[in-house]
């Protein structure tokens, strides 16, 4: 399996999307699609971990597939807005490390 950085994935998706005349959807359309994909992931989580089981004949989808769909649209949104996901995620991880440094009970080191 080939492992790619967030930057490489963003570049690959950008090349793919820009291969079409239409290019990226407008921001509000991408936001609506993010919401749609999050709803589909939520439904699968309910089927796997919740009380709501699939109806007979309902399509089987995996949490991995639905997470991938959501992430693809998120990358499209980030690309369309010129956002580096590596930079954004690095910044937020550092924010959480500082903000929540003493918020949770730490596991004892072995």
Model-assigned labels for residue ranges:
Residues 1-67, 71-110:
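Flexible "arm" and connector segments at domain edges
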């Amino acid at each position: 399996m080939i492992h790619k950085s967030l930057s490489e994935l963003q570049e690959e998706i950008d090349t793919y999307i820009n291969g079409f005349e239409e290019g990226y959807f407008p921001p509000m359309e991408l936001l609506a699609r993010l919401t749609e994909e999050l709803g589909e992931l939520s439904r699968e989580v309910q089927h796997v971990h919740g009380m709501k089981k699939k109806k007979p004949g309902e399509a089987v989808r995996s949490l991995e597939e639905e997470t991938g769909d959501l992430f693809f649209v998120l990358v499209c949104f980030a690309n369309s807005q010129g956002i580096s996901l590596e930079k954004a995620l690095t910044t937020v991880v550092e924010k959480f490390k500082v903000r929540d440094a003493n918020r949770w009970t730490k596991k004892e080191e072995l």
